[in-house]
Amino acid sequence: MTESLLFRGAKILGADSADILVQDGRIAEIGSGLSAAGARTIDADGLVALPGLVDLHTHLREPGYEASETILSGTRAAAAGGFTAVFAMPNTSPVADSAGVVEQELALGESAGYATVQPIGAVTVGQKGERLAELGAMASSRANVRVFSDDGFCVWDPLIMRRALEYVKAFDGVIAQHAQDPRLTEGAQLNEGAVSAELGLAGWPAVAEESIIARDILLAEHVGSRLHVCHLSTAGSVELIRWAKKRGVAVTAEVTPHHLLLTDELARGYDARFKVNPPLRTQEDVLAVREGLADGTIDIVATDHAPHPSEAKACEWQAAANGMVGLESALRVVHQAMVQTGLLDWADVARVMSSAPARIGSLAGHGTPIAAGQPAEFTLYDAAAAGVFAESDLHGQSSNSPYLGRDLPGKVLWTVHNGYATLEDGVLADRGARS
């Protein structure tokens, strides 16, 4: 039996204040002046209560790359950022292209206890793009996989992509595409534009993303299957998704926090913390993806949390790995880029960071409203706080954050998962997890 928790005075979705009583893993009651014998009472006055955040795009690295991250360390980072569920990308070793690997990941997440870990299955065997992986076996496994991706690699062959879309349609699955034409991005180091030209580095053109998105929209429309576009980053990509939705195509899209805030100007210092795939784009692209998220063209925010050991980033730009950690900072960045700018309110944040990703990923028990009878999956956020993002804010095994030393608003204070507090007043709780 879980501990009873009584949070007093939380502002649900940033609006009316209410008490939240948690008992036996569920929200037992919402109201004012609540009391419950034996419940631990927490002063949540003024804190914004949001449904537990759900990340549809996380790299947890286990099995195979535990020097960068483990499922335990990654879900601790998730809890610190207000997340109660993460979808684990399949670029592990072995690749998550079979029922055995996705079930292993699921079990490791259950053992850790800090957040639900929902595996994403690879589209192709070994993520090599040559033949379909065991999509049906992963879907019918205990992991109940519904999202499939070769993220890190594009499913470039149109015949393979068409067959994947056709296959997952049978069980309402979704193909999450890493939209990158590999021929157009050979040797690319950063966004193709003025900055890449000045630095003399090979550019990653916007059309390399947009051409794959355009092709896959047409394939998804032809097949009548669901397509999800990972880490959309250009103004042209936003227009393509907008066009597809007007046509009634079953397409959804995500944007990362870093593409909502940062630009390729940061590459001028050759600091590899800012090297990522797709690359940071221009200020015009940043404004376009913000607008797309605000008007519903882009469905969700997803972190693309990508931890790397220090030696993979503390090197020359050309040799550095792509990727940034983002679980602990995501909500604060969205607060700065979207809420403080007036583009989203807290109810919108709940949609793009909780209910919509859970819906796209067919994840039951998450993304539910903060209401009596619902699963106790929520986070409490101090929107009035502010501070410099520091290494002490990171709780995974890697520190390749682009926000270190940057002023960010807000602070996640409490995360409740499955009725337990995984984060208590800003401190990770001891879940008795595996070591």
Predicted feature residues:
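Histidine-rich, glycine-flanked metal-binding segment
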Residues: 1-52
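Divalent metal-coordination and catalytic microenvironments
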Residues: 10, 25, 46, 57, ...
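Metal-associated gating/positioning segment near the N- to mid-region
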Residues: 45-112
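Divalent metal-binding segments
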Residues: 59-68, 87-99, 119-132, 149-160, ...
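Histidine/acidic residue-rich metal-binding segments in metalloenzymes
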Residues: 132-301
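His/Asp/Glu-enriched, well-ordered alpha-helical/loop segment
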Residues: 198-226, 273, 294-295, 299-301, ...
